[in-house]
Amino acid sequence: MHHNERFLLLVLSLLPTLAMAENNLLPVPLTALEKQGLELKGEFTLKPDFKGYVMEYDGQGTTVFLSPDKKHAFVGNLVDSEGNNLSTPWIEKYVYAPMAREMWQKLEKSRWIQDGKDNAPQKVYVFFDPYCPYCTEFWHKARPWVDAGKVQLRLIPVAILRPDSNLKAAAIMMSKDPVKTLHDYESSHWKTRLDKPDPVPADITAALQANLLLMEKLGSNATPAIYYLSPEGRLQQQLGLPPDDDTMNTIMGGKP
């Protein structure tokens, strides 16, 4: 191979690296924002000469725009002359939609008990403690949707309310038919006797701890902690007290 050919191959091999280096050079204000903890999630162009950036901090999205000399950044929403928020769809695309997909996948991988048909169009995750009266009330309110095949509840057990919550949760999880056991327990308002293991097996303890960590990561500190996807695919949260009728219709994707 001639010297010129070797040089040409070397230059060609470096081109992707050089391109990546050039693309990674951010305007100074964006770099300063990154040092403050903001993370760049995406960029967009509204006009040929008007570019915006989407950044995220602690789960919250915002848009950033640069001055013409690129020495200053303006952080906040962009509103047009009619009051329309032009930032919202871009924040949704680059921050909240990916975040919803990620959290939904984590919910799917958690240890849950299915209550409802496989082909139910609406899936609703519910973190519950066996001693939570509001969880029981929500379970009863959800029956019309579940029984009609419109909703599948995915009930995620946690142990936070009483010292033996873990024993009751483990009894439900370890039973031959967790769905029936939970159904009998909730429908009897906790009067059904549970075969509580003592001690709780290590794998069940690990599952309960993982469920609690996920619940905390989602920002929940009360049960029931209810999660579902809006028609737009955004993760929605409902905590604590059982929802009113209108909110129930929203969670369940419609009327029963």
Residue ranges and their predicted role:
Residues 96-105:
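Long, charged amphipathic helices and adjacent flexible linkers at domain junctions
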Residues 70-97:
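A short, surface-exposed interaction/processing loop segment used at functional sites
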Residues 22, 26-52, 59-74, 192-256:
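C-terminal cap of thioredoxin/glutaredoxin-like
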Residues 1-8:
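Bacterial N-terminal signal peptides that target proteins for export
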Residues 120-130, 136-200, 216-221, 241-243, ...:
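Structural alpha/beta surface segment adjacent to cysteine/selenocysteine redox centers
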Residues 104-122:
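A short beta-strand-turn-helix
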Residues 16-21:
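N-terminal signal peptide c-region/cleavage motif recognized by signal peptidases
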